[in-house]
Amino acid sequence: MAASVRHLLKPWTPSLCLMRWSRYNPYYLDPEPRKDAPVSDSELSPEQKELQELKTVRPIKAALTGDTSSAFSDPLISKFINMMMYDGNKVLARGIMTQTLETIKRKQVEKYHKSPAAKREEIECNPYAIFHQAMENCKPVIGLASIQKGGKFYQVPVPLTDNRRRFMAMKWMITECRTNKQGRTLMYEKLSQELLAAFANEGNVIKRKHDLHKMAEANRAYAHYRWW
């Protein structure tokens, strides 16, 4: 009797599945914490209508602790804050990020008003767009892996996953801001400078990415060692 009841409730109850560290089976739908403006059924695409109907009959996963319905939340910025956090002080890391975005906004608005009218449209004043583009410019395309062959280690060029590329870009940015500050420059001031430089494809982080690409190009003779 218990086995038959469990068989009936199987799609609705969390159970073991092939996905690592997952409490839910694939029958569960992902949550949507963002509460955007409602859209009429006539404006929805067939795929959106089908997903809307599935939400009425299929269970939804529990939202993550860091999820929020705020219009100012950004997954990429949240990841950057978590990486910048030191000794568990997330309030400080979040405050630094807020001051950084505010500083970028002030600098860009000042630049906007000082520029002639013909060039104002080329100036980006949205700090979120600047942050995203700066991170995209800092992402390396290819990396190096240490592989042993015949008792000797070789630096072999290997392709990078999207998560690894994002991690390296954020790590380089944070390391640059912590180690190369001049005098008593505050963290948010240095971070805003580096983000604006990376947005323009300039700065030490962009140089570090290019150096990595040059090393990968120099070691391309060892590329066949990737299939070890």
Swiss-Prot record:
Annotated CDD domains: uS7_Mitochondria_Mammalian
This protein's UniProt keywords: Mitochondrion, Ribonucleoprotein, Ribosomal protein, Transit peptide
TM region positions: none
GO molecular function, one term: mRNA binding
Transit peptide: 1-33
Keyword Cell membrane: no
GO cellular component, one term: mitochondrial small ribosomal subunit
Highest taxon, organism lineage: Eukaryota
GO terms under biological process: mitochondrial translation; ribosomal small subunit assembly; translation
Similarity annotation: Belongs to the universal ribosomal protein uS7 family.
Name of the protein this chain belongs to: Small ribosomal subunit protein uS7m
Organism, scientific name: Danio rerio (Zebrafish)
